């Protein structure tokens, strides 16, 4: 299992922070850097939120090794043909390091504030599958494509120039829902990303995904398994307690949140690796705390190597 960093772009991300974080994450040896795609927070206050694709374009041309991408980008924000075009271009610019994370959308406030239709859950996922169909075809096939859906329609659509990477950037589908998300992942995804679940639940969903992949005629190894999760890390026990504040350690641990010093974090990561997690994206909420990020890298990454 390898480790990557995930940040919430709507929590004050600006150019200075993004550039500083990207350089630090690469220099410290993490496998990747991922970010959310939100206009604003689910609840006030509204903070800086650097635009997704502009920020990823900078990352593609100013890093050498990091894998990166949205975790995840709602199809409700952009027409799927534009998403496919931008993803292919940014992936080419990076030399093939983008993972295209996609989701149905969930945050009502930003959709209302900025004029996007969130839709009810059933229609939201219908739109998501239509978007996936178009994006996947444009990235993976050079045959002109017609599609006549309820939400999207295209005629003789083809993506040019063709992606340098055969099939374009891998598609990641994020979410832990067994009824809607997992079947979509089994059909369309190159990577499935679960969100905030403990090891036992990941193991259950991982097994269910294998069953769904078999129905689709796909090998289990064709889909990478990853998890985005929270972390409360301290260089010593006193710092762990300070970072926890008034939150209940027991309730967080019940959700599988990683809590502790470097040695404790490594032990907890081992349980996720045993459950089938191949990459874990650590949600790093303090965009300015690079000293603690460095301590995490030095204390944890070296023990995983």
Please give the residue ranges for each predicted region.
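Active-site-adjacent structural elements that line small-molecule/cofactor binding pockets in enzymes
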Residues: 1-305
């Amino acid at each position: 299992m390898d480790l990557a960093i995930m940040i919430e772009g709507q929590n004050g991300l600006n150019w200075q922070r993004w550039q500083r974080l990207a350089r630090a994450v690469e220099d410290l040896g993490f496998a990747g850097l991922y970010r959310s795609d939100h206009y604003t927070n689910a609840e006030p206050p509204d903070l800086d939120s650097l635009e997704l694709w502009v920020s990823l374009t900078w990352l593609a041309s100013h890093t050498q090794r990091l894998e990166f991408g949205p975790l995840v980008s709602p199809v409700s924000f952009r027409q799927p043909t534009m998403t496919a075009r931008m993803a292919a271009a940014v992936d080419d610019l990076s030399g093939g390091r983008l993972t295209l994370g996609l989701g149905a959308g969930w945050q009502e406030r930003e959709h209302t504030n900025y004029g996007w239709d969130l839709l009810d859950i059933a229609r939201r996922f219908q739109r998501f599958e239509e978007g996936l169909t178009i994006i996947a075809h444009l990235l993976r096939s050079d045959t002109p494509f017609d599609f006549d859906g309820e939400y999207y329609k295209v005629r003789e659509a083809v993506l040019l120039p063709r992606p340098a990477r055969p099939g374009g950037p891998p598609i990641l589908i994020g979410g832990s829902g067994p009824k809607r998300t997992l079947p979509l992942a089994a059909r369309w995804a190159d990577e499935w990303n679960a969100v905030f679940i403990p090891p036992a639940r990941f193991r259950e969903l991982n097994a269910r995904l294998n069953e769904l992949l078999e129905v689709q005629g796909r090998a289990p190894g064709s889909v990478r398994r990853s998890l985005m999760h929270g972390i409360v890390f301290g260089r010593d026990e006193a710092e762990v307690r300070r970072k926890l504040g008034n939150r209940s350690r027991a309730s967080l641990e019940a959700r599988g949140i990683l809590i502790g010093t470097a040695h404790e974090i490594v032990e907890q990561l081992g349980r996720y690796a045993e459950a089938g997690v191949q990459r874990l994206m650590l949600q790093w909420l303090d965009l300015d705390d690079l000293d603690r990020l460095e301590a995490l890298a030095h204390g944890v990454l070296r023990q995983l190597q």
